[in-house]
Amino acid sequence: MGSHPIEATNWSFECVNGTDCGSNGLWITTTSQPGTMRLWDSGTSWAILNNAAGTYSWTNLDISLDLIAEHQPRAVIYTFGHGPCWLASTACSGSGSASSGKYWSPSPPTDLTTTGSPSFNAFVTALVQHCSPAGHCVKDYIKYWEMWNEPNLTHYWNGSIAQLYNMFKPAIPIIRNHVTGAKISTPPVSGGDTAWIASWMALENANGRLSDYYGFHVYLWNYAPETRINMIGHMVTAKNTNGWTTTPWMNTETNFSVDTNLCSTQYTKADCEGQIVRWHVLQFAYQGGAGGAFHVGWYNWPSISSGGYDTYYYTMMQWLTGATFTASCTSSGTVWTCPLTEASGKTALIVWNAAGDSDYTPATEYLDYKKFNGTYGGATETISAGKVTAIGVSPIMFETAK
């Protein structure tokens, strides 16, 4: 993960606890196989793994570790979050329908001071030293670590930004000392909260860098990708403004909508299929400091199958793995173009019309184009130089001879 050209690990899937992958002991069944697994919501949170002082329940993590070991090569992201109720400064109610305050707490640990939380440090130490009964160890398989899921939302964290920094400052060296090659991401904020993440970066700048990556979560939320990329731009601009221009950035959690993980009914099926591809391409191509996205992760992976998107995701990965985008996507009206160099060395251009069907005249050096057609891998059509070609909401990729 974290490379240009794009690798398979630059995509990730997440298996929500109780769905048909992850803690039930089953691997994802899609033909498309992202190279990274993100463990958030897989039943491996702090509150679940550390259910009492000095007591650990590793069952769910062991299931994931053993599955990951069986499906190599594979990168893994662990995201901290969900404070345990036994350590909460605000007591959990133990009732109600909301998980926050019932099964876990958003409040800081009771033992958190300006020098950290001994209980959190103990959990982190136990976590990075843990191995499953089959001998599959955290230190060998989990190399990417996110500091606290969406802490700008008070149902995930209701302490101050400074308190969160204080909790992680002594914990990050524990990870680095036990996990060779560990990479740390900022706490991934949601909803384009540039003010929160700017305050976090200011703390790192003033008191010591903790992060190797800059992470956030941006869902489409019923917007077209061509509109939603503006929020990505705002987040990347905030990174650069705070002196982090060369820091790689990641959108480690996305989908259509947060609440349903479904494409809006305002769009046609063809548009929804195209949006999966357009959303990823726009991010991987966005050249806003440190190049395009180093990672894009899809939340609730079974929604790829239930939505009928597996052939599109698979074909997209086939197109982009090994490729390097040479510039951000640009638009002329509703027609978007994204230049790239493929793994083969061919010069290519991804093109679509977000508004629907139209004609497009490619430059004369393009001699064929790849398209999505509902099959794994799609199809390739040969064209004569400068041939007028039909485009639409599903991207096509023009290619040169080499």
Spans of model-derived segments:
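Substrate-binding cleft and catalytic face of glycoside hydrolase catalytic domains
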Residues: 32-211, 215-221
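Carbohydrate-binding surface patches
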Residues: 331-367
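Well-ordered, non-membrane alpha-helical segments in soluble/globular domains
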Residues: 19-25, 54-63, 120-122, 164-170, ...
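Aromatic/acidic polysaccharide-binding cleft in carbohydrate-active enzymes
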Residues: 251-335
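C-terminal beta-strand-rich structural cap/linker in extracellular carbohydrate-active enzymes
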Residues: 379-402
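Substrate-binding surface in catalytic domains of secreted glycosidases
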Residues: 211, 218-249, 257-273, 278-279
